[in-house]
């Protein structure tokens, strides 16, 4: 899938036809605030409550840095980047040339997180702080290219938090008159990263399914009742632990034997991709027992072999 900048006449035409937006950009301030709040809510009476609190604290640090240490303005450069690449995932995490700002965000993030960290986390933070520029860039390359075992789950969470904060702000600077083109929809059309979950919206986009990016936090539309990995639709099943009306379900595909969680805003308007994914880890355990492999990537849950 690619994105392109719409000319003014097409913008007016799309608006007049009530066209469903194929690409939604995040509101970072609201996103981090809602995420932290939801994580704390789900942490109550959850056996993984301590980890949800950890994720909430880190999300609040991200919000702090967003408000007080924003990245530079690259809007003109990014617009040119879309045109030069013909809209082919302009912020592709595997090829986009990062500035040093992500490393600055990492150091600020780890410093601000120290009051919440236990001894194990402090040891990880110390390793990151002592790493050279080349070592940090190598870790980022491994992480963004899905070589998680080369990074380690302990370091990956902090690295991804900084990288995601950087990429989310970059995505905010893309022209708003952009639209996705028809094509491969398995990964984010902005940065080529995997989704965390899919979300079935309510409100203006009632009933539409969007996949939520694990890196730049953008969302892109994908039709329902179609596997987000292999595009097949003949062997899809939906699973939940509590009830058939649960706000979080797992969509499994018998063709490729993968699954991705689905959040239903109509069932619970407060569902949030990262938080509700972490809050339903027992559902992951059930799906793995049934022989399905997780296709979503949660930035607080890196699977390292």
Curated annotation (Swiss-Prot):
Name of the protein this chain belongs to: Protein FdhE homolog
For this protein, the record's CDD domains field holds: FdhE (cd16341)
GO biological process assignments: protein maturation
MF term (GO), any: ferric iron binding
One of this protein's Pfam families, by short name? FdhE_central
UniProt lists the family membership as follows: Belongs to the FdhE family.
Origin, by domain of life? Answer: Bacteria
Question: From which source organism is this entry?
Answer: Actinobacillus pleuropneumoniae serotype 5b (strain L20)
